């Protein structure tokens, strides 16, 4: 008998249906009657299982993008790391996504076991070893290098340029046109004075320190993972939370800033995670250190839960400024357990951090040096395209007095920022999923070592205008390390301007 089957609809893996004993056969294939949404259908009998765990049949996968291996499927604890191009065995999974794909696979590889995100895995070795080259993306980056010498920051050719899905949280929209103030941890007791300026002048985002050397409040994560840092807490937790609540109640987007690898307190508690070098006596946790990764991500997650931030901003996501000298000295130990290049470590950390923070319903932004607008991987491991492609917002720091002392670049902020922004805008176009470009601007009298130019509202406006003139329209954050109330009073009218 010919049943004249025709396809009606497809169901994703993991869909729950009611099956009946009735089966029919066509073209040597058995079909079982099912009910779904009060309608009867026939499906290939081989596609039905009684236990949802049996719906995942794959036994082998291949690593397309180097992956962090987690101890379990629930938290941020790191078990190991597996590089691109490796075959791994699938031994289980956590949950199925709405589209039927697996969220995390339970895997094994030699003596490594744990969980990895399925989005970084593919079905064949050919796919795993390929580089993303749609619109010649990989070709754009693969041969880039600093002219004249090797910086030892890594090769652009070893970095990942596959599109990274950027979430949009319905109850927490990403700030895409920021007019942002920066507040250090010492300002918490004066929050009302800053909010008065903010509310009256169109400030729509505020960056507040969580950790910059000292902690802004008494973190339980730090108490466990870095007691030395815990002892530095500057504010009462309730006072700090009250300040963040006031920011959000004012309709202002709250960004929590964490200085990541430049952390002497964590370094004192964990010297095993720090770079050791005769070329430097700095106590600097290595960007290769998974212990430092986990500490900062757990600190960020705690801040989201306890304080209610909309976004976490990571600063100092890099190796030290003197990483070049450390590298060429030949007597430095960067604690490079997994044989990564510096830029690979930075990018791999950001994959890890973004995955963890997106689970919490918040965004990740990262600060980078102004130098990163160039067409090369820096000595300290930052490469704009490899970072912007992953994070939700990228905040470069092209301060006008940071372009050398031979020319007074600070006296004409529009020209200086305009020249810089051309490179940054070009970098944004070289990747499939660029971040929002939200730029730090100079909001202090310059140059910093001997101020001679007053940076008033017009100087702020000049910088912002240059950004928008070059298509960097994600907004700005004013950098004033002391968070001077007097300076904010002086420049407040610049926030009220329309730059779009």
Task: Please give the residue ranges for each predicted region.
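SH3/SH3-like (including bacterial SH3b) beta-barrel domains
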Residues: 2-13, 71-84
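Substrate-binding cleft of secreted/luminal carbohydrate-active enzymes
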Residues: 391-407, 413-418, 423, 427-500
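Active-site-adjacent "subsite" loops/lids of carbohydrate-active enzymes
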Residues: 169-182, 186, 242-245, 255-302
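Boundary regions of SH3-family modules and the immediately adjacent low-complexity/disordered segments
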Residues: 35-62, 108-168
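Aromatic-lined carbohydrate-recognition surfaces of secreted/lumenal glycan-active proteins
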Residues: 253-263, 313-316, 320, 340-380, ...
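SH3/SH3-like beta-barrel superfamily modules
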Residues: 10-44, 83-119
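Catalytic domains of carbohydrate-active enzymes, especially glycoside hydrolases
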Residues: 191-216, 306-311, 393, 467-475
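Aromatic-lined carbohydrate-binding/catalytic grooves of carbohydrate-active enzymes
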Residues: 201-235, 321-329, 488
